[in-house]
């Protein structure tokens, strides 16, 4: 089913001439004619449609601005202008509703509101909505009064854009834009990789130098190691010789030492015997000594262990005791807290009752006590004062202890906070490193993107300049080509008007042609003068001989062609004389010298022109002398030698012009071909540049978007934020630490204060005890205790009543803290309880062991006494023998010292040799041959090599690995670059395919519309022709669409030269051709038939009637012949300046037309 729509009705309110009331103008399908007198408001129907659909500006609607569209006349003024256009939707609009209402309201301040079916929309959204139904921004379907020729006055590009819009190639444009954006993304990545590859290339160059430096370093190191190894081998050889000498000396010294050693051995045998006996005694003593020593050590260890374990036991028991007490207290506190939290309000009431009761008892007890004291004449003030002071001290201590507890909780909280802040600071510092790395990477990428953007912007500027140059050149070429084509057309017409007299004889052998055909005027300015100079002789036909002339004459007679003159080459005679003319100003030259010809026809040319002199003008001829020469001026005046002067208007015969025009035509054809080739080349270049500009523009948009995305936060901004966070954290940490110090100081002060008050309270208690003892002696103490007890209870209740509200707020927090504390203390108590059991067992075992060991020591000391006496006698004998041996050993020692010195030197040598061997192990991988160089020379060589190594400076020992890694990275990026280039190539291919499809769709639309245009115009103007052609068929989007019209009986002419009726027919033909390709839901024509005669108006009416079967036509007309074809006639009249609408039948039309 064909999709279409039409306007059912228009609703206006406060719009232009239609007054302030809401009015409906029914329209309907088919051909609707709108008629009425001039000024009645007919055109305002079309203005209302255009206004509501946003198809025209205020200027096009004949208003200064939109607020001028609001009705205002005779003091009446509407608040707004409002128009509704009701469409019957038969599938044209992309909604399911059968009725589509589009409305627009403009207020006095010029603001507009558009709506579709009651929903407010933007103007852009409305235009998109209308375009889907075939109502476009170009509004080719709306023709205002006197505006029909706008379709002819359109520039070729505007005409092309209408066809583009109707052909629906927008989808291809969107695909192309999307592909261009994808291409820009890929190209941007390629550019980034290009920069990275450039960076890597620089790195590779540097690393290659470092690698070569490392290789040189390694070579020098190899030479250095070889030289070092050779030096070590030479030094080892020297040390081996020295060792051999010392070994020989040692051999002699050792022989002397052996003799002394023998004497010493003999004396030592005897000494040994005594020492053996001493040893036996010692061995007998030793077990006892060892046993005693062992027992003593064990006893000491046991005592030490007992002390340590007893100390640990005592500490653990004390700690357990403290813990149990603390846990009991904590549990008690916990129970109290739990009970108090649950029953605090009830307890408060109970305490108040109890307080009231106790207060009464207190007063009674106080009265009894005072009576007793009065009886004993003892004042109770002092006791009461002590009681109050003690109570105050107790309260103060309780308050201080509570404050201490709160401070301890506060201290724990502060420590936790300090730890958390320190952790946060460490975390912040750790995160900073990662963030800085991330920001630096982003900054590097931004740097690359900005470099690419800068380069691309520069290239875009250059391309734009280049495009402007080429477009300017293209415009010049096209202008020049147009001039060439005009000139060529004029020349072609001139050439066609010529007829060669020699053509009838062209088949006869020996005929060369007319004189005019055989010569060529050198300068076009001389053509008129040469034609006059040659006169009728220029038409003479040149033949070979008289026989040929005879044959031609006979042919002319047979065919009754008229008379001809012939010049036989074998008979022509000329007078040979030198041609001289006075060298006077105004003389040009003899005519024979101003033409070109074949030397074969020289006599003919001289015969025709003789001695005729060409001069510039009449005055020049007079100056030379009339009658002296046969002369012709450039304007054609002829001066005969006889004095006869011939002149006046000269009508060119064209005999010479033909040759000139033919040559000029050849030149122009060549120039046309050249210009067309140049045009094609320039167009191709412009296409390439435009494609590049599109790619560069898309790439710049993508790079700008990426730079914006990456530029969220720079290193400087982050560092500022980091420093601020760090400083804030450190400041907060400092504040917390200061608070902690303050809390610690307060706790210290509280401890001192608590200690002071506790001591003071003890003193008061002692003083109170003295008084109470005095009272007890007097029988008052009992009453005093009763009173104190009651007084204490009252005080406690008062204290509870005062504190209960304050305590209630702390209970929950303290309860949580107590539970944690209890759990921790219970775990510690369990551990210590087990430890105490273990310690007690260990101590018990150690005491038993100690007692047993002491008993064994006593028994051993009795047995060892006799052995000690024998030991003392043997020690005396041994001392004498040792004295004798002393002298021998001194001599032995001297020898040994010498041997030792030698051995020491030998050892040093061997150590050196060993060290050299160790050092030489580092050079085991070297293959060294015999070297005759001395150590000094080798050291000199080593020094030289070392200096060369130092000259190399710092060496990158990872150069080879770095080079390999960077080369791999380079190759990886190269591979990525290749893949991206392939992707870019694929996208470009897609763009090209899309462009080809777009071109194909456009050309199909163009060809179909052009075909319809030819047919419709030939119908409206029989014998006439109209067609469109593309400026550039190969690339239609680089040029425009030209329109040529040839009305019946006329040549092709410029549109400006056509009559109003001809222009109307041409414009309507184009509109109907567009309508045939893609009909708009409606067409609005306002007096498009104004310039048409009756016949053409009738044809237009017939055509509209025919086309109205496919689309709605709303036509404002004053022509009865047009209206006669309408399906419905809407009449418009004006009463009191307000337009009214009514329906007419064709019979009432004539009257309306006459009124108009």
Swiss-Prot record:
Coarse class of the protein's main subcellular location: cytoplasm
Family, similarity comment: Belongs to the SMC family.
GO cellular component: chromosome; cytoplasm
Coiled coil stretches, renumbered: 167-499, 654-1001
Function statement: Required for chromosome condensation and partitioning.
Domain notes: Contains large globular domains required for ATP hydrolysis at each terminus and a third globular domain forming a flexible SMC hinge near the middle of the molecule. These domains are separated by coiled-coil structures.
HAMAP family documented for this protein: Smc_prok (MF_01894)
Keyword Coiled coil: yes
InterPro entries: P-loop_NTPase, RecF/RecN/SMC_N, SMC, SMC_hinge, SMC_hinge_sf, SMC_prok
UniProt-listed GO biological process terms: chromosome condensation; chromosome segregation; DNA replication; sister chromatid cohesion
Annotated transmembrane regions: none
Subunit structure, interactors included: Homodimer.
Keyword tags: ATP-binding, Coiled coil, Cytoplasm, DNA-binding, Nucleotide-binding
This protein's name: Chromosome partition protein Smc
Pfam families listed in its UniProt record: SMC_hinge (PF06470), SMC_N (PF02463)
Subcellular location: Cytoplasm
Residue ranges annotated for the SMC hinge domain, each copy included: 509-624
GO molecular function: ATP binding; ATP hydrolysis activity; DNA binding
Residues binding ATP: 37-44
